[in-house]
Amino acid sequence: MSELNESSTSKFVTINEKGLSNFRIHLNDAGQGERVIMLHGGGPGAGGWSNYYRNIGPFVEAGYRVLLPDAPGFNKSDTVVMDEQRGLVNARSVKGMMDVLGIEKAHLVGNSMGGAGALNFALEYPERTGKLILMGPGGLGNSLFTAMPMEGIKLLFKLYAEPSLETLKQMLNVFLFDQSVITDELLQGRWANIQRNPEHLKNFILSAQKVPLSAWDVSARLGEIKAKTLVTWGRDDRFVPLDHGLKLIANMQDAHVHVFPRCAHWAQWEHADAFNRLTLDFLANG
């Protein structure tokens, strides 16, 4: 297998979808086999490769083609102000990318905002949806037990509005259960991504002012989703409440949940080995 790194797997596609006309999407494309599309979260500086770099190798070695798009308005993809809820627009961007690449059907892995995109994709394009793997997905409305928005979401919006290294540290301290793993390399890498395109930050805020988070809620339609689904959650998630996982398995047609202890909002990173074993087994046998 050729060397697996960000630069060697990097490419761009141009899509034409509603709200995304002549729009460039950056992605990383690695491996061969059944397609798995990994959708990243919505924090400032997020991107496909950085969100999943602890998972790409094991998936490729297991015989999957892994595609990691940067969502519209993130990392190397074009910037955008959205007039519709972000999960739906992101789902359209995935469909557009698949069209350009000639991919008819794919499994979807989605973390946080990426989970919201995966849910919307399954609702809009069920015939093109394989299995779903969701980690603390957004887009599920209020919580029965937790005041919303949660602490992490408040810090996320603070970082978008007033980007600083100190606010980034505060957000990462909430983002991860074990704060000792927040290395200077992780911090500086994320900070560099944030600074690379200030328009992304400004346009995220403008989009949120036009379409609030409450508009993302697809709870009423969960029963329509037929795709086999693995839901994972960090017991200590301070961005999206744990009871949303119960909402998913109570309403979706074929879903089960796995909760990681000593884990916050980034299960695929904090518990990478266990996550990789669990999800690869689900794709092969679930």
Swiss-Prot record:
The gene is bphD. Keywords: Aromatic hydrocarbons catabolism, Hydrolase. Catalyzes an unusual C-C bond hydrolysis of 2-hydroxy-6-oxo-6-phenylhexa-2,4-dienoic acid (HOPDA) to produce benzoic acid and 2-hydroxy-2,4-pentadienoic acid (HPD). Substrate binds at G42, G43, N51, N111, S180, R190, W266. The keyword Cytoplasm does not apply. The lineage of its organism: Bacteria, Pseudomonadati, Pseudomonadota. GO terms for biological process: biphenyl catabolic process. This is 2-hydroxy-6-oxo-6-phenylhexa-2,4-dienoate hydrolase. It comes from Pseudomonas sp. (strain KKS102). The record marks S112 as: Transition state stabilizer. Pathway: Xenobiotic degradation; biphenyl degradation; 2-hydroxy-2,4-pentadienoate and benzoate from biphenyl: step 4/4. The keyword Nucleus does not apply.
